[in-house]
Amino acid sequence: MFDRIALISIPVKDQKAAKKFYTEKLGCTLIEEMPFGTPDTLWIRLALPRADTELVLVTWFPQMKPGSVQGVVLTTKNLADTHAKLKARKLDISDIKKQPWGLEATFRDPDGNGWVLQQSK
């Protein structure tokens, strides 16, 4: 019935600042950036490394306040390596914690949206 989750809307205050964070800190690739609706609003679509699901940095959903997205899980086969690379990019990321399902670390974007980086057992 469904193929996949194509896009996840990430609510942000400042689209340009958020784009810089997601591309420089997380290594996302800019797919497209164009005017959207009002002159101050952009359609910014990003690709996560090696993922099918894309991110859209949104400001136009009043019910989605910046920082309201929590618990989006990114997976990796080698959390220690990924964690070290993100720390080298000056990402404020938690220490790696052992959980019943594997290893995980958490971080937030500048708007407070919460992410989980996970390595399964």
Where are these regions (language model features)?
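Core segments of cupin and vicinal oxygen chelate
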Residues: F2, S9-D52
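Short, solvent-exposed beta-strand edge segments and adjacent coil->beta transition regions
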Residues: F2-L7, G67-G71
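Vicinal oxygen chelate
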Residues: K13-K16, P66, G71-G114, Q119
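A short beta-turn/loop motif at secondary-structure boundaries
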Residues: F36-T38, Q63-M64, Q99
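Short, charged/polar surface micro-motifs in flexible loops or helix N-caps
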Residues: P49-E54, Q63-M64, L79-D81
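Short, charged/polar, Gly/Pro-enriched secondary-structure boundary elements
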Residues: A51-L55, G112-W115
